[in-house]
Amino acid sequence: MDRRGAPVKQDSAKVEQRMEELRTLLEYHGHRYYVMDEPEISDAEYDALFRELVRLEEEHPEHIHPGSPTHKVGGQILDGLKPREHSLRMYSLDNAFGIEEFREFVERVVRLEPDAPLEFWVDPKMDGLAMELVYENGVFLLAVTRGDGSMGEDVTHTMRTVRNVRMRLNPEIEAPVRLEVRGEVIITRADFEALNARQQQKGGKLFANPRNAAAGSVRQLDSSVAAARPLRFMAYGVGQVVWADGRQRWRTQYDIMRGLQELGFAVPSQGRLCAAPADVEAAFTELSAARHELPFEIDGVVAKLNDLDLQEALGFTARAPRWAIALKFPAHQARTRLKDIRIQVGRTGVMTPVAELEPVTVGGVTVSSATLHNEDEIRAKGLMLGDVVIVQRAGDVIPEVVRAVPEERTGAEREYVFPAVCPVCGSAAVRGEGEAAWRCTNMQCPAVRKQAIIHFVSKAGLDIDGVGRKWIEQLVDSGRVVSPADLFRITREDLLGMERMGEKLASNFIEAFDSARHESTLQRFICALGIRHVGEQTARTLAARFGNMDELMRADQETLQSLRDIGGEVAGSIRAFFANGQNRELLQQFKNLGLWPEEQQPAGDSTPVTPLAGKKILFTGSLVRMTRSEAKAMAEKAGAAVMSGVSARLDILVAGDKPGSKLEKARSLGITVLTEDEFIRQASESEEISGQAADDYENSLLRVQ
C-alpha cells in the first residue's frame, strides 16, 4: 500500500501468494470463531483480511479459487451435534464501512433495478449466534445453527430451554403452516456481567464476551447447561414461509417484523422503517452514538430493502444477498507505543514483521501486538521504534497499526532496519524482484520446517482432525517430529511423554494420523505439500489431470503449462519442487508409509456434453420429482452453472409449481423457460460422461425417475 492507502501494483505471482495466505488465514480464524468459539483476532481484523481478499479477487479474477472464504459463509459441523440442512440457505451479509460504501451499495441496486423503491428496514446488527427456529402449524419443531449457510447443527434440545423461545405461537394470530424464523441468540450486557460473577464465585472459567458465552451455551450436548444460562432469541427475518392457502401474507420486511412480533417473537425495539437512503444514514449515525447504551452488544446496523418482490428480483451473490448490507461502526482507536518489531518466519520462509506494543485497551480488548505485513508497510506508515502510534480494531475486532504520531517524537526513536538474516537460523534473507516479502533461504530452517508441518495437518492441508498448531509445535520443539512423514511413524508412547497428553487423546491422535494416511484425497495431499503457488484450485486441476503422484512427478514443464489455471511460473514452481532431492526423499517416505493417494478415475478432459452444458440455469417454484438440492446437483453434473437470481445473463429458468415473480421477469427478458420434466429430459441427454462420473450421473437420474 502507498501512503494514501492505495494499492501498489503487484506482479501476478506475488498477488497469488498473498491471496493464498489470506485464504489460509481466513479459514483458520473462521474455524476459531465459528467452530471453536475461541477467536484469536477481532471482527475488525477478520474484516480487514476479508476485504483485502475481496479486493484482490476483483482485481485478479484469474486467481479466484472456488473454495475461497468469500464464496461461503463460514463455519463447520461439530462432532456430537447432528447436522441438518437448511431448506433455504442462510446467507452472510456484505459489509459497508462508512456512509460512502453504503451509498455505493445503493448505486449498485439502482443499476440492477433502476425503478426500485429505495425504502429500507433497518435493524441493529446484534453480536450473537445466528439461529433458525422452525415451526409447523404454530408448534416449535426444531432449531438449527447457521453453520456454513447450507448445513447447520441441530440444537433443538438447547433452544427449547431458552426462556423467550415459544413452544407454541400466539393462537389468536394466523400462523403459517411452516415458518422458519431467523435471528440471533444473545446474552444482554447485564446478564453477562451476572453470569461471569457467578462463574467467578464458583471458580469457573470466565467468558471473554457475551457472544462466546451464548454460542458455547447453545452448543452444549447437555441441555441443562443452556437452561442455566440467560439466553435470549431475537428475531430479524424468515426463511421458508408456507401459508395454508398458498397465498403470501407478508409483502415487505416491515410486514415480516410486525408479523413475527404478533406471533410472539422478540424483535429489536430499535428496528425502524426508513423511507429513503438518507434516513438509513441518519439511523446509522444515531445508533452509533447510542450503541453503548443499548442492553446488548451491536457492531453496526443492517439495512434491507423493504419490498420482498424487489429482494427476490435482486437475488444473491455466492455468499450474500444483493438487497441487504451491514453498515459497520467506525473502528475503535487508541494511542500506545511501538516497543519493538519482531519477525515471524512462515512455512515458505516469508519473514513477517509483527509490532510489539505497550498493552492498550481498544474497544474493550487488550491489544499488545499487530501484524505489519511487510517492510513496505513499515516504510509507508513511517514507523520508528519507540514511536507513539495509533492502533485500531477495525469492525471492532482485528488490531492494526494505523500510523505513527511524529509530532510526539522525542529524538529517542530509532529507525527500524529489516534484518538481512533469518532471526531463527541465521541464514541469509533475500527479497525477490517485484516481491514485498523477505524470505529465509534455508528450507531446513527450524521455523520453516515447523510451519510446513503445521500447514500439512491444517484445514488447508490434510485437515487432520483434532491435531492443532500447539500440539505440532510441542511435537517439533521436543524433537519427536522433524518432517511431516514423522507424524505417521509416531507411537502412543511418544505422545504420552508430552505435557497434558492423556491415554484417550494419544489414541485419538494415532487414529487421526492413520485415517489421514488411508483416506486422504490426492487433491488434499498436493495442497498439504505446500508447493509454492499451488492452492486448492491448482491442486484440484493437477489431481484431475494426472490421477496419481507418480504421473504428476513425471510431468514436464510443457505438459503442466498446457493445463487450465497453470502458467509458466506456477509450472516452474511445481517442477522445481519435484526436482529437489530433499523433497523427493520426503515423498518416497510418504509412499513407503502408505500415504500415496490416487484418484479413483483420472478425469482428464472428459466432461458432460448435454443441452444444458455451459448454460446458466435457475430454479423457481416447488419441484415435484426432486428436491432443490438434487436438481442443483443434476444441473451441475450436466455441465450447467446454477444461478441465484434472474438477470439478462441467465439462459434457462426451470419453473415448478407456483413460480412467482421470477417467471414473469424471465419471460420479459426472453429467457428460455423449462418445466421440471423438460429439465430432467435435457439433463439426461448426455453424449460423453466417463468413468465414475458416469455412474454418479446415472444414479442422480435414477433417484428422480
UniProtKB/Swiss-Prot annotation:
CDD domains: BRCT_DNA_ligase_like (cd17748), LIGANc (cd00114)
EC number: 6.5.1.2
SUPFAM superfamilies: BRCT domain, DNA ligase/mRNA capping enzyme, catalytic domain, Nucleic acid-binding proteins, RuvA domain 2-like
InterPro entries: BRCT_dom (IPR001357), BRCT_dom_sf (IPR036420), DisA/LigA_HHH (IPR041663), DNA_ligase (IPR001679), DNA_ligase_AS (IPR018239), DNA_ligase_CS (IPR033136), DNAligase_adenylation (IPR013839), DNAligase_N (IPR013840)
Leading EC class: ligase
Binding site residues for NAD(+): 43-47, 92-93, 123, 146, 184, 304, 328
Spans annotated as Disordered: 684-705
Catalytic reaction list: NAD(+) + (deoxyribonucleotide)n-3'-hydroxyl + 5'-phospho-(deoxyribonucleotide)m = (deoxyribonucleotide)n+m + AMP + beta-nicotinamide D-nucleotide
CC annotations in GO: cytosol
Sequence positions that bind Zn(2+): 422, 425, 440, 445
Annotated BRCT domain residues: 607-696
Assigned keywords, A-Z: DNA damage, DNA repair, DNA replication, Ligase, Magnesium, Manganese, Metal-binding, NAD, Zinc
Biological-process GO terms, alphabetical: DNA repair; DNA replication
Names of the cofactor(s): Mg(2+); Mn(2+)
Molecular-function annotations in GO: DNA binding; DNA ligase (NAD+) activity; metal ion binding
Domain of life: Bacteria
Alphabetical list of Pfam families matching this protein: BRCT, DNA_ligase_aden, DNA_ligase_OB, DNA_ligase_ZBD, HHH_2, HHH_5, Nlig-Ia
Gene3D superfamilies to which the protein is assigned, alphabetical: 5' to 3' exonuclease, C-terminal subdomain, 6.20.10.30, BRCT domain, DNA ligase/mRNA capping enzyme, Helix hairpin bin, Nucleic acid-binding proteins
Active site: 125
Described purpose of this protein according to its UniProt entry: DNA ligase that catalyzes the formation of phosphodiester linkages between 5'-phosphoryl and 3'-hydroxyl groups in double-stranded DNA using NAD as a coenzyme and as the energy source for the reaction. It is essential for DNA replication and repair of damaged DNA.
Record-stated family: Belongs to the NAD-dependent DNA ligase family. LigA subfamily.
The protein's name: DNA ligase
Record gene name: ligA
